[in-house]
């Protein structure tokens, strides 16, 4: 499975709504389920890729250089897109600055999504350091304040909801 080419074009539009369509993957294949940058990869494993929307956030949906944001987020509709049940998965593909990655995810949640039934965040890093108190506190804050558990792994995450 290879990554899609949907995000190679420039996204225009003033409002988030105008930018949303151009920031959403239009692939009609399983490429919709994967993102990859600089050797870091996230794969969403679901039975029907048509129930997934992949949205590029950084440089597409949100272009403001001063605003922190994660790289991608996925909407997954486990009961089909006609149902009101949707899950949001925030993905940051990062080198080794985990604190910065967490801050980007939190900023994206605050900016975009407040009332999603299930949220989960993922950081795929080149090197995940030993857990320290700062990282643990940020993870706990994310879980408590946004009800959003966080998974951090090196190089690749394959997630099956």
List PLM regions with ranges.
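Conserved catalytic cores of phosphodiester-cleaving nucleases, focusing on short active-site segments
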Residues: 72-74, 87-95
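Arginine/glycine-rich "motif VI" loop of SF2 helicases in the C-terminal RecA-like domain
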Residues: 111-118, 144
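Active-site metal-binding core of divalent-cation-utilizing nuclease and nuclease-like domains
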Residues: 32-80, 100
């Amino acid at each position: 499975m290879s990554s899609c080419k949907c995000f190679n074009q420039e996204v225009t539009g003033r409002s988030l709504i105008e930018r949303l369509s151009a920031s959403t993957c239009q692939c009609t294949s399983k490429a919709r389920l994967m993102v990859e940058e600089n050797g870091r990869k996230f794969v969403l494993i679901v039975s029907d890729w048509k129930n997934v929307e992949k949205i590029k956030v950084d440089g597409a949906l949100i272009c403001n250089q001063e605003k922190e944001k994660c790289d991608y987020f996925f909407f997954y509709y486990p009961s089909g897109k006609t149902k009101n049940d949707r899950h949001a998965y925030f993905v940051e593909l990062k080198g080794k600055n985990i604190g910065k990655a967490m801050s980007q995810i939190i900023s994206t949640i605050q900016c975009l999504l407040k009332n999603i039934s299930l949220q989960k965040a993922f950081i795929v890093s080149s090197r995940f350091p030993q857990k320290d108190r700062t990282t643990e506190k940020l993870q706990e804050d994310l879980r408590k304040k946004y009800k959003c558990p966080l998974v951090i792994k090196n190089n690749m995450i394959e997630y099956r909801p």
